[in-house]
């Protein structure tokens, strides 16, 4: 905690010093596109992969108050919450696992080496988000490991103006919230600071929480070179009734801290664009089995990752060449998982080519990743070291193909290899009931997709069908009931699915805006049986999923949104959840009322943790320039 606060203080002092330097001539900062993916930058509708963007307008209109709720409104995404306000949530894409999804902030990877359960610890307040880009499919070629089924990139606000806003809210379960956002422009720079505080007594026994979030962003110049810096800190303390272990474990408790600091810039020279970034990411997790008596069972894990990434785009006679290199060092200190140290090197290259007056585009690519502490084995089921182990780079190629019938309609297809290395929990976790396996090899899959994209003025439509053949998937197995679960690479899973998304924006009168978004997904898994008598791996993906939002303006001051979710998991009954939000604007004030689960549906999303019934939240926001 002290190291984190010191880092943020140093960052703030450094930025303030830069800001304080005055220039005689005011400099207009250009937009710095620090992300959006490391690959070739083209409009999402023209990409030959599955890309969906949640705009700032959609975020503002949404019934969601956090990213977990927001992503639940997208077909093909499965955010499984334990409790409210996203205190603990797992992120799944297209039926994969929570360890197979990568989260990024402004292009900085925030995966956790301990476990994918911590992926959503580093999410940001909605107030500081410009948009969210969602890449589905084999994304490891672009982003590296963990992007097994896709990647989600949170892009922070770029347009920073002179503005201060305050917000207060309260509601069911004794929820209390407060936030302040300060945006300030200077002669040659700008800065955005946001602080959020949320707390609740919980919607049932031992589900109370306290959550503090701090975010800073600044654009400034050093010797006429534009630099963007970000820093974020998220502190959570929450009761975890039935969150892990079993539903009978009602007295669990957890505290997590996640933080990130990053700097990025852009160099342009003729036909070359270079985008370097430097970053540090930290996560701390303290878990106790009995909140009243931590000495019974307590785990403490602290991970740190320092990295540098450089991506480049080069125009050439064939089209555009994308190159990238990512070097990082990750450490973990844990009373259960031990002391771990990992060096990682990831390089990738892809060449986009266009033919027939740019109607046909072809993008082959390849990526190579090396981990200092992970080997391959000729026998993935082995639990003992042998001469068959070699520490070699992982190589995974892919290719994208698209055909534009016209400016509105595109047919696309892609195929590529993807992978996910085991977490330290998979390898080294030890308890009376579960034993890791340090000799696990990486999961791998071949993913292919065929889809169409149609975009016309205020209407857009996408449809895609995909196949993922995964092997060496990690499962926990045993032959006798009295034995502990042991991790092994024994699963083979073939996943077939399709998705449909449609958006339409229209106007009634001179100011009444209406926007409808509809999504549908279907997943079918074919799980190969194993030789073991007992398996802990249970397919629980969303078999069918329907999402819909309808936002509309009654007049220039009143706007409302209805969010609909219908889902059915394998071997479970389907459920429907309906949320509603209405806002009233008067001068500098905005009053909002959110009604969640209006139908009072009884349902669970994971681990038999019941979600709350009908609940409400009332908030007020004051903004001044």
Regions from the language model: what does each represent?
Residues 68, 72-108, 112:
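Extracytoplasmic beta-strand/coil segments of soluble accessory domains associated
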Residues 109-136, 155-157:
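Short acidic/polar hinge/loop motifs at secondary-structure boundaries
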Residues 200-207, 211, 225-305, 332-339, ...:
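Flexible loop and strand-edge segments within Gram-negative outer membrane beta-barrel domains
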Residues 20, 219-222, 234, 351-352, ...:
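Conserved C-terminal beta-signal and adjacent last beta-strands/turns
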Residues 150-151, 156-184, 194-195, 200-207:
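Short strand-turn segments of transmembrane beta-barrel domains in outer membranes
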Residues 315-321, 356-357, 362, 467-469, ...:
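Gram-negative outer-membrane beta-barrel transporters
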Residues 245-268, 387-400, 404, 410, ...:
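Outer-membrane beta-barrel signature, preferentially recognizing the C-terminal barrel domain
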Residues 32-60, 90:
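N-terminal periplasmic "start-of-domain" segments of outer-membrane beta-barrel proteins
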């Amino acid at each position: 905690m002290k190291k984190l606060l010191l880092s943020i203080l140093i960052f703030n002092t450094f930025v303030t010093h830069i800001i304080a330097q005055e220039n005689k001539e005011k400099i207009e900062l250009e937009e710095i596109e620090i992300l959006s993916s490391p690959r070739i930058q083209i409009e999402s509708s023209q990409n030959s992969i599955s890309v969906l963007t949640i705009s700032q307008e959609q975020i503002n209109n949404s019934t969601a108050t956090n990213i977990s709720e927001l992503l639940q409104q997208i077909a093909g995404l499965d955010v499984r919450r334990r409790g409210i306000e996203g205190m603990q949530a797992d992120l799944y894409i297209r039926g994969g696992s929570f360890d197979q999804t990568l989260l990024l902030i402004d292009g900085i990877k925030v995966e956790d080496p301990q476990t994918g359960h911590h992926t959503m610890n580093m999410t940001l307040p909605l107030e500081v988000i410009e948009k969210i880009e969602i890449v589905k499919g084999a994304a490891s070629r672009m982003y590296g490991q963990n992007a097994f089924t896709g990647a989600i990139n949170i892009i922070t606000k770029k347009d920073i103006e002179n503005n201060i806003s305050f917000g207060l809210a309260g509601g069911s379960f004794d929820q209390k919230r407060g936030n302040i956002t300060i945006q300030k422009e200077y002669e040659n720079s700008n800065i955005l600071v946001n602080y959020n505080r949320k707390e609740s007594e919980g919607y049932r026994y031992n589900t109370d929480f306290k959550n503090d979030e701090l975010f800073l962003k600044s654009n400034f110049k050093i010797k006429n070179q534009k630099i963007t810096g970000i820093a974020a800190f998220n502190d959570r303390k929450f009761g975890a009734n039935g969150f892990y272990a079993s539903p009978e474990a009602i007295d669990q408790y957890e505290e997590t801290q996640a933080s990130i600091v990053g700097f990025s810039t852009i160099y342009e020279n003729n036909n070359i664009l270079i985008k370097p970034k430097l970053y540090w990411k930290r996560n701390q997790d303290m878990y106790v089995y009995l909140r009243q008596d931590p000495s019974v069972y307590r785990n403490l894990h602290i991970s740190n990752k320092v990295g540098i990434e450089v991506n480049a785009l080069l125009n050439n006679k064939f089209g555009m060449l994308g190159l990238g290199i990512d070097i990082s060092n990750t450490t973990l200190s844990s009373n259960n998982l031990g002391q771990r140290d990992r060096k990682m090197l990831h390089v990738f290259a892809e060449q986009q080519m266009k033919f027939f007056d740019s109607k046909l585009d072809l993008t082959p690519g390849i990526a190579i990743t090396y981990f200092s502490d992970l080997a391959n084995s000729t026998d993935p089921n082995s639990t003992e070291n042998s001469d068959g182990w070699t520490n070699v780079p992982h190589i995974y190629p892919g290719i994208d193909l698209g055909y534009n019938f016209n400016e509105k309609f595109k047919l696309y297809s892609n195929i590529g290899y993807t992978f996910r290395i085991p977490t330290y929990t998979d390898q080294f976790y030890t308890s009376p009931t579960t034993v890791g396996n340090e000799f696990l090899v990486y999961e791998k899959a071949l993913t292919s997709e065929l889809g169409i994209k149609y975009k016309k003025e205020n209407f857009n439509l996408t449809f895609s069908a995909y196949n993922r053949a995964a092997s060496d998937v990690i499962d926990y197995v045993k032959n006798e009931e009295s034995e502990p679960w042991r991790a092994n690479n024994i699963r083979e899973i073939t996943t077939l699915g399709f998705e449909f998304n449609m958006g339409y924006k229209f106007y009634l009168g001179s100011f009444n805006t209406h926007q409808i978004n509809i999504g549908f997904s279907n997943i079918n898994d074919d799980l190969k049986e194993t030789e073991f008598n007992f398996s802990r791996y249970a397919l629980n993906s969303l078999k069918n999923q329907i999402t819909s939002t309808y936002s509309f303006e009654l007049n220039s001051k009143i706007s409302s949104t209805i969010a609909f979710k219908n889902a059915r998991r394998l071997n479970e009954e389907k459920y429907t959840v309906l949320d509603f939000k209405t806002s009233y604007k008067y001068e500098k004030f905005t009053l909002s009322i959110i009604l969640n689960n209006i139908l009072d549906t009884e349902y669970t999303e994971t681990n038999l943790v019941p979600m709350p019934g009908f609940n409400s939240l009332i908030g007020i926001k004051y903004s001044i320039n």
